[in-house]
Amino acid sequence: SGNEDAGNVKPAAGTKENKSDKEKDKPESGNAANAKATSNTKEDGGESGTKPTTANKDKDVDVGSTGTFVIPKLKKVSPKMRLPMVSNKAILNLDHLIQYKPDQRDISNARATHTQFQFWYNRIKKEYDVDDEQMRILMNGLMVWCIENGTSPDINGYWTMVDGNNQSEFPLKPIVENAKPTLRQCMMHFSDAAEAYIEMRNLDEPYMPRYGLLRNLNDKSLARYAFDFYEINSRTPNRAREAHAQMKAAAIRGSTNHMFGLDGNVGESSENTERHTAADVSRNVHTYRGAKI
């Protein structure tokens, strides 16, 4: 019947399912397991996109090649040199000394310091009652005037500046009195500008400063050094240095500085007790050997 056929089919189906479950639980053989692992590895590698790495080969070294030679660098200041010592300790910092390279003009005692020059400039501006822009024009005129007339501490009166055909006069008193240590040392700050100015004037026409004319300087190429506040430095040519020294020696030759001037109190305080009569020869002579003349 239909029910009996259905009952007979069910056990057959169950038997088939049990058989398939047993096949799943049955362990795989060794070769099959290795093959499966290999296939899984290939699939994983394909999915990740990685490629097998190969070892980097070292470059071949030529037996006849030589290495590089390094030139030894000597120390600029050797620590073995004899240094000033206090309590067996050096009092110099060599690391700072190697880097300390100041401009020789800034540490020269032949020119005014920056503080002294600033004080001189401000005092002149105050006494002339001008602003900074006007002071710059006056400094141009003062520099050119000093090129021609020098910077002697004995100068007095007025210095002049020309505006077209008009001549303007300015007192020298604030310039000389406020210059510390001296006017020449203050004017040495203008040395490079004065040298360039003389060179510029010579481009238009022959120009020799009065300082060079008085010293009878014949070489026109040395005109740029012919002013008394020129500052000699390491770049000064030998001929220019010699010419400047000769002009300076000629300018100060025969000049003497007296520490003391003539005392104004020259009267004598002694009392003259001599008595003279009208018959005396003179005020200081009574007679010659007792005879009247």
UniProtKB/Swiss-Prot annotation:
Coiled-coil intervals: none
Gene Ontology cellular component list: viral capsid
Disordered: region residues: 1-64
Keyword Acetylation included in the entry's annotation: yes
Residues with the N-acetylserine modification: S1
Comp. bias regions, Basic and acidic residues: 16-28
Pfam families xref list: Poty_coat
Protein name: Genome polyprotein
Organism of provenance: Nigerian sorghum potyvirus (Dawa mosaic virus)
